[in-house]
A protein has these predicted regions:
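Basic, flexible Lys/Arg- and Gly-enriched helix-loop patches that mediate nucleic-acid binding at interfaces
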Residues: 2-241
Length: 241
């Protein structure tokens, strides 16, 4: 892919187009072994080597991060009142990243951060029915009857019932622990489903989205780039090849 030098640097977060143009004109940018002072020259992202103030700037058209979202941050690109998930991604190069879908402010777990709009669309499309797996603690005893009702679909105040969901009881006491697989992503869906059977979610964590499984080595608030294998599997499960 070929890009103007100023766009290349702006895309990689060096600064605004105006700022990087000034840096180029001042001689702070080298392409391969030559200092370049023309912002408009074309860069081949696959062949050329760009340096800013002596440091290499590799071009990444898309970035993909797995985040273990902590409670207390919001799934948004910006927010006036709360810290956002993007503020946790300190090593990001691009400024156009966004969370794929959303987790409630008090919900923890797997969140994909990227700037790949086509992949995000495929993963979130209601036509794709990409599985999402959650662990939850529930106030009250979860029963076999609840399993049956979840499998049939529940009325949660929408035009249609939820799609069949797979509910697995891990522990059933006054505070139950469960694992739930749903195939859609309605607003507050897990909480509303349990409310429909007379119970309340007191803790919620997403473990998996499609083929992407939360890395158990990631502490809350930590993130890492997706591996090539993880990205390929995600594209497979969303039929994006």
């Amino acid at each position: 892919m070929k890009l103007r030098l100023d766009k290349y640097l702006a895309d990689m977060g060096i600064g605004t187009r105006t700022e990087v143009k000034k840096a180029i004109i001042k001689g702070q940018v080298r392409v391969n072994e030559e200092t370049v002072k023309r912002p408009e020259i074309k860069i081949d992202t696959e062949k050329d080597h760009v340096f800013y103030q002596g440091k290499p700037v590799a071009y990444a058209e898309y970035e993909y991060y797995m985040l273990n979202k902590p409670a207390g941050v919001v799934s948004a690109t910006e927010d006036k009142n709360d810290r956002t998930v993007l503020e946790l991604i300190e090593e990001k190069q691009r400024k156009d990243l966004f969370p794929v879908g959303r987790l409630d402010k008090d919900t923890e777990g797997l969140l994909l951060i990227t700037n790949d709009g086509e992949l995000a669309h495929q993963l979130l499309s209601p036509k794709k029915h990409v599985d999402k797996v959650y662990f939850a603690r529930i106030d009250g005893k979860v029963t076999e009857e609840d399993i049956r009702r979840f499998a049939e679909g529940l009325e949660i105040g929408e035009e249609k019932p939820t799609l069949p969901a797979y509910l697995e009881i891990l522990e059933t006491e006054e505070i139950s622990e469960i694992r739930l697989t749903i195939r859609e992503g309605k607003f507050h869906q897990v909480k509303r489903m349990f409310h429909a059977v007379g119970k309340e979610v007191i803790y919620l964590k997403r473990l998996q989205m499609g083929s992407l499984v939360l890395d158990p080595q990631l502490a809350l608030g930590e993130y890492r780039e997706l591996t090539g294998q993880e990205l390929e599997a995600l594209r497979d499960c969303s039929s994006l090849r």
